[in-house]
Each structure stands twice: as structure tokens, then as C-alpha cells.
């Protein structure tokens, strides 16, 4: 299983003029008068051809009239997307707030930003942005207080190319940097000699999701890669036949040795981890669930040169639970796991037991429990348990905010880190020898601040804090609990300006995700301040399906119970209205990826409940999701369309298949990235086309295609400002909010 951290211009493809499109297709007879009063004339949607395609699922004939949109590079698809882009641009350009919003967002984002320092050898590295740079530079210093120099500047890259990650060699002399074309998940890894500033000839291609790992000598690399896709199939190709490879610096990657693969299980994906000693290559294997909460097998390969042709040792098989590799100490490998502990615990195993350490059912003596399961769930994000300075630093979640506790390696609890408040703590990375480490703390209205922790004493000191141009004290954050449809209490954060009146007239933006065991925790977004400044409320519902309360919370809303996620979100909206925070005409909703599915399902189930909706990179065709990219790996959460019982549940809520002609839908903007290889853009294309054809009311249905971006990764600062200005302008206009 892979965990991915993401930080949320060319012309549109195709050379077809709008006139040519109209000649070929005509103009749709579906017209929508502008609900916000922006346009003088009604919207005329470009025609999307409806064909008679039918699929047979377990004896049920299911229409798919926009199947042709899955051919992303076809002239017809390109022409339709171009016409949709022109329509959306013409609508957004007429919103008075758009220009002022861009100006305000530019000011809000214009402050110096620092990333957390990390070290390799004698060098320290950290990201830095002076304010409005397109992408942050990576700086390096000799020692923590040394003079900074640029290790790498993504701002010198060609247009459309963005940085996907960095890895420094253990001696700090070589920097591996990943490049993404247009924000795609596909990443090419290059290597730079930091002394000369020149790139080495080595390039690792067709990697996704995982960073490469260096051996302690800094000359050897292990990495995960896929076979090269056929030309034009980069966004459609399923994530199959992954393998771990070995690369020696200075050699051609075409001769790299395949270290581990399972051709009999083409859907398995592998993440390499190298122990600090270099003795063991630890491989976690997942059944295709990338970036999501899945179940792992764990294997270990002895890299001791005296052990020739060492076999791969199976430590855990059977995909029984989640296993996250934490580190190595004195011959023991440490893992965070959910086996027999839905809220998580820390265990250790000696791999020299040669496979006798498989943990089944009640557990085996070869596995030693270090930190038992507690009342709060361990954060499932990568790095939630770190082995640093002969201690384990464990991040847990209490009602969807961070707690951090430090343990000795024998499991003895030492202390709880005194965090600045209610928010999200991350980082805590380092080596077993480090005495001081860094962590990041962030809240909904407080940008990330960096703290320095003395691991032995437990004292924290502020190391760096940003200086934004707004006063965070004017805002209030509070948490409430509301009942869902079945009575389950769901936590929700509310953020708003102090002194706001709860009279049902406040424009409110409700956000949700609810899937794959991913916890939605407090995080900062400069653009959100512009919403709050104008009297808007921002609400975050911590829905079931996430990981906020551990694996049981996740499992309550998967496969046949996925409807509970939508029930939780709808109940949040109803509660906000009943408590006079807002009202239907003032209530906007947003979500992305699995959260985009959430928005699609909720607007098709309850179009009467919402005043406007933003659906980002959503999974909208739940009967075809497993046919593209990493979609097959989502079956654990969604179920399989090939399974009759799963099909019934999927068919019942699939947004694309539940758009009903003659329905008055609220204003909706469907947003996707043209390089999204994770959730293929066709999901959004088909959903938007179906909504436009079905719309019986006056509200606009728009499709916005983000250029040179993927599944949330890749946009420059100016692109972020543009996208946020468009989104908030759309909401402000359609929720009749005070505009700047």
C-alpha cells in the first residue's frame, strides 16, 4: 500500500474551433437561465452525442451513452472539452467578484513559507518559497545554521513540468528529484551531484507513488516501477505488473536488475523500504490500493553480501491487516499494524527467524508487541509512528485532531508532546541517533509552524513561523457532534468569523471525504481566508469511511455500506440548516477524488438540499472505475461491479448512472485535471454531460478542466490562485454572498 502526500499552460488539446463543433454537432437544446443573474442570455451547452451503448451487468442492461468520452484523445472528445472550457470561461469571466478575489488571494498567498528541515550527512535541506514563486525551491545548508544555497529550483523547469519529490543520499552528496509532466502520477527520477550542481546521466522511468530509496553507501538505489505504457495509454493503463528494481548509480537503467515481482499476482504493488543498517530490504505488498487504506503482506530480503542468493522472507502473508514499516533497531523490524487492533498498535519482529514470524489470528511468539492498542486511533498516515533517538514517536487522533506520545523501545510510555493547540502535527522524522527533530503544526486558520523537539527531555521550541497578512484571531474554530441517519454521532469542525449571527443566512461551505480510512484533519488553506473574511462558514464533517476513529470507523462505510458516507454528509447539511447556521440557498458543498464521488452522489440523491456544489476529480462512473489506472485497487472500499451484490450497491449510488432527466439540479461545477492518471478525466466528462442533458432548472452545470495538472498535484501558485478564484467566485455568485 502506498501513502501519498499531495499539496492541493498549454492550450486545451485539439484544434477544433467552436464554429466547427457547432457545424458538426449543433447546439444543445438544453438551456439554463443563469441563476446568479450573471449572463444576459441563457447558457447553451455544447451537444454531447448520446449513443445507444449498453452494458450487461448480471442480466441488467445499463446504458452508457457517453462511453465515447473515455477516448480522451479522439477528435470528438477534444472538441467537446474545448467547447465546454469556452462556455465555463465565458460564465466565470462575467462574475464581478472574480477579479477582486484573484487580487485578494494573491495577497493572502504572498508570505514567506518554509518546509520542515531534514538532514542527510552533514547537510540540511528544506523547501522555501518567498511568497508567490510558482513552485518552492529546495535549499541546503552545511549544518543547521549554515548559509542556504539552492539545491534545486523547480522554477527553472520547462512549462508543464513540476516537482514530484526529493530524496537525498545518506551522505548528502546526491539529490534524487522526481519530475512529473502536467501533474501526472507518472514520475521520472533524476540525480544531481550537489557539489557540482550537475545532473548525472541516470534516469528512472515509469515510477508512480513511491520514492526510490538509497542504500547506506549512497551508490545503490531500490525503486518500484511499472512496465512502460503504450503510446497514448498513459492515463488509461491499469496499474499492473509492478516490480522492485535495483539500480547502481552510473549505469543505464535499462540494465537494472529486477529484485522482486509476483507475476502470478499482476495487481500487487510493492513499496521498498531500506533499513538504516542496509541489512534488510523490507517490501510491503498491497493489492493495488495506492494512497488508500489497504491490507499488506510484508517480505524481507537479506542484503548482507555474505548471504548469496538470499531468499525473500515472508514475514506476513494473507492480507490480514495493515502494516506500516517504522524502522529497525538492534536486529528488530518495527511496524504499525491493525491486526487484532483496529485502532492500531506497534509490533516488532526479528526477520532472521526465516519466515517463522508470520502473525496469524491471536499472534505468534516471534512477533513482540511494543505499544498496545489505545483508546485513540493511531494516525494511519505514513510516518505516524517514527523511530527516532531510541524512541518511538506515536501520533494518535482524538476526535480528529493530533496527540503525540513518546515511548521507549521497550514500550514504556515517557511523555506526551505539548502541542500548541487543537490541530494537526506531522513530521517527527529522523534517525535513531538524532537527539533533536522537527515537526509541523497547523490549524484551520493558522499556517504551518515548525517546532524543534528535544527527544530526550520532551521540550518543544518554535523554530520557524510564517507571517501571513491576516489576523487569525478574528476567526473561531469549534467542534460539534451531530446525529447521522442511523443515530451515529459524527464530529464536524466549524470555522467562522467571530460575532457571526446564526440566523440561517450565512453562506456555508461543507467539505467531506469519507473513504479508504483516510482521516480529514485540520489543515490550512490561504484561499479559505477570503471566504471567511466575507462572513462565510467553513464546515468539515469527519464521515465514516475515514480513519478518524480507527479501522472500525472505516469499515462501517465500505462496499455495501457505502451509502452511510452519503447519509452522514446529508445529515451534516440538514443539521447546519436546522441549527440556523445556514439554509439551502446559502449552502455550498465540495469534495475531491473519493470526496468528488461524495458530492456527485449527494447532489443526485438530494438535489433539493444544496445551493451549489464543487466536485473535484471525482469517481463518477462506479460501474467502470475498475477499468482504468489504479481503479482495480479500490475494490476493497467500493466493491467490484463484477460481483452481483456489489453491483447492486454501486448501481444504486453511482453518480453518472443516477442523473435523472427533468430534475432541477443546483449550480454545479465539475472540475478535473487533463493529466489525471489516478481518476481518469472521463469520469468528470461523462457526469457533466449527463447533468447538462438532464437539467430542468435554471442553475448552471459547468465543466472546468485544469490544464497541466493531475490528481491535485502539479499546479503552480498562479494556477492555484486562478482555480480558487474561479471556485469561490462560482460559489459567491450562486449563494448570493457578499462579493469583494
Residue ranges: model-predicted function:
Residues 269, 278, 293-298, 321-323, ...:
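Active-site lining segments that contact anionic ligands and/or coordinate catalytic metals
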Residues 1-12:
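N-terminal secretory signal peptides that target proteins for export/translocation
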Residues 527, 534, 540-740:
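Active-site-proximal cap/loop segments of hydrolase catalytic domains
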Residues 29-409, 413-422, 426-436, 442-448, ...:
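Beta-propeller folds
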Residues 129, 338, 442, 511-516, ...:
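Glycine-rich His-Gly loop
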Residues 15-26:
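Bacterial N-terminal signal peptides
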Residues 335-339, 385-390, 394-399, 482-490, ...:
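C-terminal substrate/ligand-recognition segments
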Residues 155-166, 179-184, 198, 455-459, ...:
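Cap/lid segment of the alpha/beta-hydrolase catalytic domain
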Amino acid at each position: 500500500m502506498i501513502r501519498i502526500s499531495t499539496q492541493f499552460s498549454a492550450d486545451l488539446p485539439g484544434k477544433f474551433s467552436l464554429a466547427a463543433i457547432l457545424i458538426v454537432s449543433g447546439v444543445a437544446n438544453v438551456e439554463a437561465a443563469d441563476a446568479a443573474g450573471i449572463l444576459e442570455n441563457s447558457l447553451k451547452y455544447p451537444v454531447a452525442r448520446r449513443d445507444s451503448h449498453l452494458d450487461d451487468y448480471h442480466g441488467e442492461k445499463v446504458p452508457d451513452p457517453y462511453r465515447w468520452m473515455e477516448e480522451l484523445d479522439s477528435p470528438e472528445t477534444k472538441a467537446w472539452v474545448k467547447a465546454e472550457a469556452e462556455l465555463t470561461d465565458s460564465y466565470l469571466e462575467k462574475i464581478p467578484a472574480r477579479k477582486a478575489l484573484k487580487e485578494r488571494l494573491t495577497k493572502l498567498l504572498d508570505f514567506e513559507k518554509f518546509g520542515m528541515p531534514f538532514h542527510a550527512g552533514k547537510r540540511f535541506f528544506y523547501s522555501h518559497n518567498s511568497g508567490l514563486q510558482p513552485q518552492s525551491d529546495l535549499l541546503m545548508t552545511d549544518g543547521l545554521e549554515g548559509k542556504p544555497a539552492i539545491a534545486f529550483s523547480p522554477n527553472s523547469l520547462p512549462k508543464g513540468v513540476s516537482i514530484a519529490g526529493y530524496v537525498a543520499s545518506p551522505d548528502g552528496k546526491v539529490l534524487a528529484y522526481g519530475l512529473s509532466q502536467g501533474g501526472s502520477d507518472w514520475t521520472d527520477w533524476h540525480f544531481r551531484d550537489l557539489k557540482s550542481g550537475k545532473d548525472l546521466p541516470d534516469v528512472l522511468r515509469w515510477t508512480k507513488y513511491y520514492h526510490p530509496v538509497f542504500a547506506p553507501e549512497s551508490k545503490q538505489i531500490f525503486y518500484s516501477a511499472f512496465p512502460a505504457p503504450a503510446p497514448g495509454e498513459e492515463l488509461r493503463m491499469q496499474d499492473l505488473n509492478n516490480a522492485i528494481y535495483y539500480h547502481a548509480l552510473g549505469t543505464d537503467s535499462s540494465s537494472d536488475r529486477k529484485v522482486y515481482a509476483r507475476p502470478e499476482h499482476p495487481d500487487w504493488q510493492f513499496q521498498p523500504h531500506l533499513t538504516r543498517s542496509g541489512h534488510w530490504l523490507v517490501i510491503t505488498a498491497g493489492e493495488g490500493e495506492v494512497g488508500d487504506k489497504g491490507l499488506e503482506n510484508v517480505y524481507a530480503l537479506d542484503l548482507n553480501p555474505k548471504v548469496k542468493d538470499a531468499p525473500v522472507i515472508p514475514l506476513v502473508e494473507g492480507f490480514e491487516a495493515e502494516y506500516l514499516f517504522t524502522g529497525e533497531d538492534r536486529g528488530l523490524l518495527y511496524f504499525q499494524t491493525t491486526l487484532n487492533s483496529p485502532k492500531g498498535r506497534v509490533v516488532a519482529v526479528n526477520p532472521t527467524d526465516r519466515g517463522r514470524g508470520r502473525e496469524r489470528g491471536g499472534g505468534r511468539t516471534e512477533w513482540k508487541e511494543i505499544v498496545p492498542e489505545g483508546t485513540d486511533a493511531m494516525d494511519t498516515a505514513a510516518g505516524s509512528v517514527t523511530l527516532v533517538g531510541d524512541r518511538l514517536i506515536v501520533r494518535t487522533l482524538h476526535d480528529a485532531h493530533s496527540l503525540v506520545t513518546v515511548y521507549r523501545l521497550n514500550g514504556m510510555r515517557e511523555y506526551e508532546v505539548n502541542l500548541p493547540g487543537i490541530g494537526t502535527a506531522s513530521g517527527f522524522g529522523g534517525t535513531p541517533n538524532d537527539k533533536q527533530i522537527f515537526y509541523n503544526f497547523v490549524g484551520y486558520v493558522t499556517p504551518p509552524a515548525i517546532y524543534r523537539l528535544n527527544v530526550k527531555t520532551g521540550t518543544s521550541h518554535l523554530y520557524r513561523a510564517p507571517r501571513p497578512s491576516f489576523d487569525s484571531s478574528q476567526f473561531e474554530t469549534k467542534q460539534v457532534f451531530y446525529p447521522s441517519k442511523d443515530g451515529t454521532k459524527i464530529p464536524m469542525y466549524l470555522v467562522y468569523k467571530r460575532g457571526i449571527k446564526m440566523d440561517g443566512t450565512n453562506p456555508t461551505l461543507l467539505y467531506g471525504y469519507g473513504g479508504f480510512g483516510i482521516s480529514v484533519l485540520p489543515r490550512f488553506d490561504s484561499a479559505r481566508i477570503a471566504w471567511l473574511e466575507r462572513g462565510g462558514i467553513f464546515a468539515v464533517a469527519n464521515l465514516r469511511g475515514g480513519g478518524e476513529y480507527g479501522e472500525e470507523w472505516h469499515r462501517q462505510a465500505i462496499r455495501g455500506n457505502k451509502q452511510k458516507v452519503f447519509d452522514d454528509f446529508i445529515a451534516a447539511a440538514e443539521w447546519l440548516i436546522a441549527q440556523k447556521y445556514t439554509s439551502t440557498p446559502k449552502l455550498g458543498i465540495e469534495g475531491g477524488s473519493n470526496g468528488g464521488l461524495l458530492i456527485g452522489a449527494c447532489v443526485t440523491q438530494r438535489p433539493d438540499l444544496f445551493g451549489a456544489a464543487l466536485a473535484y476529480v471525482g469517481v463518477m462512473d462506479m460501474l467502470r472505475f475498475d477499468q482504468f489506472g489504479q481503479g482495480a485497487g479500490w475494490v476493497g472500499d467500493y466493491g467490484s461491479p463484477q460481483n452481483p451484490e456489489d453491483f447492486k450497491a454501486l448501481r444504486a449510488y453511482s453518480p453518472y448512472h443516477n442523473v435523472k432527466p427533468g430534475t432541477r439540479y443546483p449550480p454545479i461545477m465539475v472540475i478535473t485535471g487533463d493529466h489525471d492518471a489516478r481518476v481518469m478525466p472521463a469520469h468528470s466528462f461523462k457526469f457533466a454531460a449527463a447533468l447538462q442533458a438532464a437539467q430542468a432548472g435554471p442553475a448552471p452545470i459547468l465543466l472546468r478542466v485544469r490544464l497541466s495538472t493531475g490528481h491535485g498535484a502539479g499546479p503552480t501558485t498562479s494556477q492555484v490562485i486562478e482555480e480558487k478564484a474561479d471556485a469561490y467566485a462560482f460559489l459567491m455568485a450562486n449563494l448570493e454572498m457578499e462579493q469583494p
